[in-house]
Amino acid sequence: MNISEAAKLVGLSTKQIRDYEKMGLIKPAVRSLSGYRNYGESDLERLHFIRHSRNVGFSLHQIAQLLALQDNPKRSCREVKVLTAQHIATLNQQIEQLQKMVQKLQHWHDSCQGNDNPECLILNGLNG
């Protein structure tokens, strides 16, 4: 199947697929006589894996690590669990930071009278 069909099937753009190929996340596609990329079932499975990994926030570097583990028949599930635990910790830190941002913005928003007065507590807060 060509790159457009593969992209549509796995929910990625053709550019993403080309980029993943350049990064080595997927093997270079077999080319047709006319030079078009052709993708097989194993390519689609790998692209699905990449998309699912991106959907849960793994970086491309982390995905490369996960793919290397997946490709290694002697892998240890422990290694995968460690990578996942690290990612969960990072996500929890990001959630904490976002919650602090929301609290600060909510405080400014609640303090703002929202009237025609030029004095704005939100802008004052943003000015430090």
From Swiss-Prot:
The keyword Transcription regulation applies. This is Probable heavy metal-dependent transcriptional regulator HI_0293. It is found in: Cytoplasm. NCBIfam families: CueR (TIGR02044). Residues 1-69 form the HTH merR-type domain. GO terms for cellular component: cytoplasm. It comes from Haemophilus influenzae (strain ATCC 51907 / DSM 11121 / KW20 / Rd). Its main location: cytoplasm.
